């Protein structure tokens, strides 16, 4: 019987630092067995470019799960259409990048793996290839048939979830609705209990407008949308407070008594999180039937293949994925 979490790791955009940070794993203590999904030739070529001495072993579906072995990584080969060069995007390879996610979903559905960790992809080149793509979060939600998911970034004791994700700022206010906000808070509360083993999680909710609307003088979303949802959930004994002015919420006095923050939009919450824990933070998708974590950074094309990429966030993403699998098992999920 397999007891240790079985982790899948998609390599991401092959021209970026995804291959670099994945290869670094061969020299680190990992939380459990990891299977890479990507182009085997690309990984071998990048290892040569970086001067890394390791073994890359092909893995076929149906094989025993890879054992932990220092200096060895196992790869489920998903070939690229064109050879990969560090730092140079190629639209022809965009379908293969998405194929790694599809292959991972196949293994998860089959019960052959327990969690998915993703290295960064390049949204622009995928869209340039004629494939509509907003991001990992939305792609995996569609693949899982999950009507609503929540993006959470966590690092150095701070957890920040988002009420809206990849939207132009001009569209945010209209996207913050009572129904959507209630769903987001319920997903966040459940994840804090089941994935992070917090029995009574405490959540701080940010306002949308400066000064949380200043009593309606700087916007009505706090009074009309956010506060009623908070009050309703408080009536169910959930430990949720707000709406707080965002510049007040992100201060030590309030954060020390909180398990998570809900920000209304991407650039309200994530700049603080990344300033606090960049390179150590983990992106976690809540509301999926699978466990999915990712790094807190992008493809960094400018340093791909140079040896300057740091894999700290990826190591923490693997640790977090394994921890969530264990916590869900303990909770009977």
Curated annotation (Swiss-Prot):
EC number(s) on file: 1.1.1.262
Binding-site positions, a divalent metal cation: 166, 211, 266
Entry's Gene Ontology BP terms: pyridoxal phosphate biosynthetic process; pyridoxine biosynthetic process
Catalytic activity: 4-(phosphooxy)-L-threonine + NAD(+) = 3-amino-2-oxopropyl phosphate + CO2 + NADH
GO MF, one example: 4-hydroxythreonine-4-phosphate dehydrogenase activity
SUPFAM superfamilies cross-referenced by the UniProt entry: Isocitrate/Isopropylmalate dehydrogenase-like (SSF53659)
Cofactor note as given: Binds 1 divalent metal cation per subunit. Can use ions such as Zn(2+), Mg(2+) or Co(2+).
Cellular component GO terms held in the UniProt record: cytoplasm
Pfam (any one): PdxA
Cofactor(s) listed in the protein's UniProt record: Zn(2+); Mg(2+); Co(2+)
Location relative to the cell: Cytoplasm
More about this protein: The active site is located at the dimer interface.
Function in brief: Catalyzes the NAD(P)-dependent oxidation of 4-(phosphooxy)-L-threonine (HTP) into 2-amino-3-oxo-4-(phosphooxy)butyric acid which spontaneously decarboxylates to form 3-amino-2-oxopropyl phosphate (AHAP).
Family: Belongs to the PdxA family.
Alphabetized NCBIfam families for the sequence: pdxA
Quaternary context: Homodimer.
Protein name according to UniProt: 4-hydroxythreonine-4-phosphate dehydrogenase
């Amino acid at each position: 019987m397999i007891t240790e979490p079985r982790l899948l790791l998609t390599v991401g955009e092959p021209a970026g630092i995804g291959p670099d940070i994945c290869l670094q794993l061969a020299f680190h203590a990992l939380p459990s067995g990891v299977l890479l999904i990507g182009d085997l030739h690309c990984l071998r070529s990048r290892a040569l470019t970086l001067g890394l001495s390791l073994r890359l072993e092909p893995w076929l579906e149906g094989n025993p799960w890879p054992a932990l072995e220092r200096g060895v990584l196992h790869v489920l080969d998903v070939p690229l259409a064109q050879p990969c060069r560090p730092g140079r995007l190629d639209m022809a390879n965009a379908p293969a990048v998405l194929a790694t996610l599809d292959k991972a979903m196949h293994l998860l559905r089959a019960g052959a793996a327990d969690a998915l960790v993703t290295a960064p992809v390049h949204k622009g080149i995928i869209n340039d290839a004629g494939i509509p793509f907003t991001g990992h979060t939305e792609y995996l939600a569609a693949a899982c048939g999950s009507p609503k998911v929540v993006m959470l970034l966590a690092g150095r004791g701070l957890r920040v979830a988002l009420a809206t994700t990849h939207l132009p700022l001009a569209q945010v206010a209209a996207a913050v609705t009572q129904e959507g906000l209630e769903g987001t808070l319920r997903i966040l509360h459940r994840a804090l209990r089941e994935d992070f083993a917090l029995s009574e999680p405490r959540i701080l909710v940010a306002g949308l407008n400066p000064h949380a609307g200043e009593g309606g003088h700087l916007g009505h979303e706090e009074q009309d949308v956010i506060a009623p949802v908070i009050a309703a959930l408080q009536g169910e004994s959930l430990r949720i407070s707000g709406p707080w002015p965002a510049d007040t919420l992100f201060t030590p006095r309030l954060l020390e008594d909180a398990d998570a923050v809900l920000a209304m939009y991407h650039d309200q919450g994530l700049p603080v999180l990344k300033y606090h824990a960049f390179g150590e933070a983990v992106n976690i998708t809540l509301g999926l039937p699978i466990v999915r974590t990712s790094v807190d950074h992008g493809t960094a094309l400018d340093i791909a293949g140079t040896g300057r990429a740091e894999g700290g966030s990826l190591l923490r993403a693997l640790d977090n994925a394994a921890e969530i699998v264990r916590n869900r098992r303990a909770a009977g999920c």
